[in-house]
Regions:
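A generic structural micro-environment signature
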Residues: 24, 29-31, 62, 75-77, ...
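Glycine-rich, aromatic-bearing surface loops/beta-hairpins
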Residues: 113-166
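Plant-biased recognition of short, low-complexity, intrinsically disordered N-terminal tails
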Residues: 1-6
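Long, charge-patterned amphipathic interaction tracts in eukaryotic proteins
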Residues: 47-122
Length: 166
């Protein structure tokens, strides 16, 4: 019982923080659509949303979300110690821990997720362009990778489900 409450609390926080940082479920679903439309004729937006919801319901995904967003928020407030403060605040390209954390999300649905993640990280469509816009004054060093990873994992899930139907 107590364990259930704790789990709900983590999911609530993860979803609340995504929203507060400017990311809606439909923004991530748009990325899934972008990744999958060429492989599934008649792909529906509601299927993309449903798969994002499934990914968001996983505890390991929620853990990655609250950890990454927490670090972004603290960096934005200048509350981390050096050298980590500067590394995260400036999104230093050699840091790489943001991507490692995102891999824990991509991993949930197997290896095809990595291809999707790499592709979307290069293209930066939709919400990813917004999250990478440094002129907003926001620190999204972790969040951009997390959002790309959720989209990649949801795409893998959708592809697996479609393969099972065929
Ligand atoms: Mg990053």
């Amino acid at each position: 019982m107590a364990e259930d409450k704790k789990i709900n609390h983590v999911e609530e926080k993860a979803r609340k923080w995504l929203k507060e940082r400017g990311v809606e479920v439909k923004d991530i679903a748009n990325l899934v659509y972008f990744l999958q439309e060429k492989y599934h004729k008649n792909l529906k937006m509601e299927d993309c949303i449903a798969n994002v919801e499934k990914v968001l319901s996983k505890r390991e995904v929620q853990n990655a979300i609250i950890t990454g967003i927490q670090l972004d928020i603290l960096a934005e407030k200048g509350m981390l110690e050096e050298p980590l403060q500067s590394i995260i605040a400036t999104d230093e390209s050699l840091y790489g821990v943001d991507e490692i954390l995102a891999f824990s999300i991509v991993n949930v649905y197997g290896s095809i997720g990595f291809t999707n993640y790499g592709y979307i990280d290069k293209q930066k469509p939709g919400i990813l362009a917004y999250l990478n816009d440094k002129s907003t004054g926001k620190c999204n060093t972790f969040l951009d990778d997390i959002v790309g990873a959720i989209a990649a994992a949801a795409s893998s899930r959708l592809a697996h489900a479609a393969a099972n139907v065929e």
